[in-house]
């Protein structure tokens, strides 16, 4: 992100069992040229770090407009991080996969919000904005869909073993994996 931007850009989480996860938030450049060069920013965040040695898992939230840029970044960093998951476009892609060197990837996980909308905004106002360019947008009311991914990693290598998209509720077709399944698998209390 540009120098002086609030926030950390990356943070470490230490789990109760001692495993350590590094989470990086990176901002892409296509259609967002004021951001720092994303490849270099990620490289600087990973400088002198080894997946599986310094961290049990490294997860990148890749915020960007262009699918091509996100896919290029994922292939460039394949094997150096556990997972790269795209955000920003509000619409989930159906390309969740493990790349050849062990990095889980999905171009965009989509939004958590009402999909009976225009990317989460009230439809009539969003449509009017295309005609008048003056409309103020408001968040769409209604049932929300929770979108995300569940990534399983190897505790020693940090490489991904699986990635499963999550879509629960609302108007999108749900995935087979839901919070009840995840809770049962990992012993979570919900």
Predicted regions and their residues:
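Acidic, metal/ion-coordinating pockets
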Residues: 1-190
């Amino acid at each position: 992100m540009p120098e002086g931007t609030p926030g950390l850009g990356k943070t470490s989480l230490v789990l109760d069992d001692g495993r350590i996860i590094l989470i990086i938030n990176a901002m892409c450049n296509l259609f967002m040229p004021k951001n720092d060069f994303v490849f270099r920013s990620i490289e600087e965040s990973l400088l002198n770090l080894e997946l599986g040695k310094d961290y049990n898992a490294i997860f990148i939230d890749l915020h960007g407009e262009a699918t091509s840029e996100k896919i290029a970044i994922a292939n460039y960093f394949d094997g150096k991080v556990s997972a790269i998951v795209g955000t920003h476009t509000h619409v989930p892609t159906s390309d969740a996969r493990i790349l050849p060197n062990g990095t889980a990837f999905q171009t965009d996980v989509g939004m958590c919000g009402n999909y009976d909308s225009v990317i989460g905004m009230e439809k009539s106002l969003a449509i009017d904005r295309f005609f008048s360019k003056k409309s103020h947008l408001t968040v769409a009311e209604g049932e929300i869909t929770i979108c995300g991914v569940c990534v399983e990693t190897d505790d020693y290598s940090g490489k991904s073993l699986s990635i499963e998209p999550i879509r629960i509720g609302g108007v999108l077709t749900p995935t087979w994996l839901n919070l009840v399944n995840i809770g049962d698998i990992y012993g979570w209390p919900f």
